[in-house]
Amino acid sequence: LDSANIEYIKWDMNRQLTEVGSATLPAERQRELWHRYVLGVYDLMDRLTTDYPHILLENCSGGGARFDPGMLYYSPQIWCSDDTDAIERLKIQHGTSMCYPCSAMGAHVSDCPNHTVGRNTPFKTRGHVAMVGTFGYELDVTRIPQEDRDAIPAQIEEFNKFNKLVRTGDHYRIGNMFEDNTWDAWEFVAKDKSEALFEFVQVLGRPNERSRRIKLKGLEADAYYYEENEPDKKISGAALMNAGINIAKIWNGDGLYGDFCSKILHFIKV
């Protein structure tokens, strides 16, 4: 680590601990080894962060499921899973966010076809899903389609625009892929309720499907909000939370049609 100006470390261990035993412990204490191993990892992390406090350390869920509160003491972010498919990540990130802040969830835009499931998903959808976590890119930018490469600057700009809201806002799970695997949605609301970010993913398109009406959460009921792209259309927080918004297949001229498509809406208080 002293050999160069290293600012970031990904600590990974993609292997299994099998037939674990210790020649220094008696038979009745062999099961201590797992606990002792974790204490040893904590000691290593402590020495690493003490000697190199400027380094951003990212831990990994692999190699013993080290996505735990103890690891967050040493590293502010942890890689959720090597399964980076955007649709698979909906369940992974939904469950992880039940216990851990979104700022801790390692999430990247990865290549397609996805290396885990072989699925192709739109570049935009991959970006919207990764925005829930730390956001980054897990691909070779020189080998992706030119259209996707051209979209990267705007995607990064969009992430930076909403980064603070996602990190510090209240997180609401609007959809639930565990109950209905055809769609998912979530929302981030500023602590002062001045703005809200709503994200929607249509997982599977279905024939003759009616538009969905989705109710937002956490807004100020007596205040009025407008969607960033429609500043002249004012809607009360009460209406957005009780009547909801209409999710149609064709949304404001922008096609929300087919599998794996996504949309974000940014509501701002008047």
Residue ranges of model-derived segments:
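Glycan-recognition surfaces
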Residues: D2, H35-T142
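Active-site beta-loop-alpha junctions enriched in small/polar residues
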Residues: M13-Q16, C60-G64, V203
